[in-house]
Amino acid sequence: MGAKSDITENECQRLDRMFQEKGYADYKWIDPQKIIVSQWVRMKCIFGCGEYGKNACCPPNVPSVSECERFFHEYQDAVIFRFEKAVDKPEDRHRWSKKVNIKLAKLERDVFLAGYERAFLLFMDSCGICADCSATREGCKEPTSARPSPESMAVDVYSTARQFGFPIEVRTEYSQEMNRYAFLMIR
């Protein structure tokens, strides 16, 4: 739990049970104040990511880097979830991450309904819920489920994951195992 945690031990145990019942075993409670937000991550989105301007939950359709940083500082408790997989082709990754992201959206909803009105999820990959993204927030077909990825919120996932003791490396081939991370902001 976060350094100034608002969540009691009983609440934490109740949420742990919920996560585990839904099949999530590889996660840690974290202090969201320690999530590393960096301008270089946004630059990688703008100059290097094929989703830029084509996804309603990716830049330029997300808050500025300073607004992202302020967002994380409003929370005391969060959870980082780790997902690992090796795939042969980029399409395989997107198919897998879409399934995972849909399940994660349901988890966020369940946490919200459990009384955590501030629950907010960052998907483990770009949204990808719809086959045909509108590319704008206004035109989003799934506004209650669509969420940004940590990278689109300028999170340095590499440094943040390592800081919390998780493995992550740059892959040089799609067939190498990847570690993807989702963040559930709770309170």
Model-derived features: positions:
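TRNA-binding/sensing appendages of the translation machinery
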Residues: G2-I30
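Catalytic cores of enzyme domains
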Residues: A25-I30, K34-N55, P59-R187
